[in-house]
Amino acid sequence: MSKPSDHIKRPMNAFMVWSRGQRRKMAQENPKMHNSEISKRLGAEWKLLSEAEKRPYIDEAKRLRAQHMKEHPDYKYRPRRKPKNLLKKDRYVFPLPYLGDTDPLKAAGLPVGASDGLLSAPEKARAFLPPASAPYSLLDPAQFSSSAIQKMGEVPHTLATGALPYASTLGYQNGAFGSLSCPSQHTHTHPSPTNPGYVVPCNCTAWSASTLQPPVAYILFPGMTKTGIDPYSSAHATAM
């Protein structure tokens, strides 16, 4: 590639004047040495020179600069290489991919001002929501009317004891939760056998005192009787 004819070289400075002869000499002495290594060694040697040793090369650089200004009075230095800061800036700038619009209303194909109208009209905005699993919406209290509450009360009057496997262990006779059927069938209430703090409505007969007595395990050793180790039975008989 040919160089442009209008390119004007810069005038040499003192280091370039000195290194011009030294580079040729060092390249002849070390033919396998790379040019960058030669430049490093020449720079280190230039710094070790005294001002008296540098003076002839400084004067020669001033003469060359004055001659260059006479030959090219309109010369302006224009670097062909980009500055290092611009190279670093261009190196780490990566274009970000377009991930699409994050607004779901715009992605649905709605006009620009449609989102404001949907916020002011809940009925319109509800059409874009997924269907709820519950039959009644928490946002519409009109659905909880008296007829809806009556429909919720229409449950079977008596559940079979086999449907609830723990009904027999709790002492229910006519159904596990038959009291949940209708208010007219609630004959009485009694404390729960498992938790006396709760009252259970039921249409069965009341529990007797013997059914509320917790079971007691006895361990009899030779020479011992049950009456001697049963303080609970004696205390219960005294209270009765």
From Swiss-Prot:
Query: Pfam families from the xrefs?
Result: HMG_box, SOXp
Q: What CDD domains does the entry give?
A: HMG-box_SoxB (cd01388)
Q: Which residues bind DNA?
A: 8-76
Lineage: superkingdom: Eukaryota
Q: Example GO molecular function term?
A: sequence-specific DNA binding
Tell where it localizes: Nucleus
Keywords assigned by UniProt? DNA-binding, Nucleus, Repressor, Transcription, Transcription regulation
InterPro entries, per the entry: HMG_box_dom, HMG_box_dom_sf, SOX_fam, SRY-related_HMG-box_TF-like
GO CC annotations, alphabetized: chromatin; nucleus; transcription regulator complex
**Residue intervals passing through the bilayer:** none
Task: List the SUPFAM superfamilies hit by this protein, alphabetically.
Answer: HMG-box
Give the record's GO biological process terms: brain development; entrainment of circadian clock; negative regulation of DNA-templated transcription; negative regulation of transcription by RNA polymerase II; nervous system development; neuron differentiation; positive regulation of transcription by RNA polymerase II; regulation of neuron migration
Its biological purpose is as follows:
Acts as a negative regulator of transcription.
Q: What is this protein called?
A: Transcription factor SOX-14
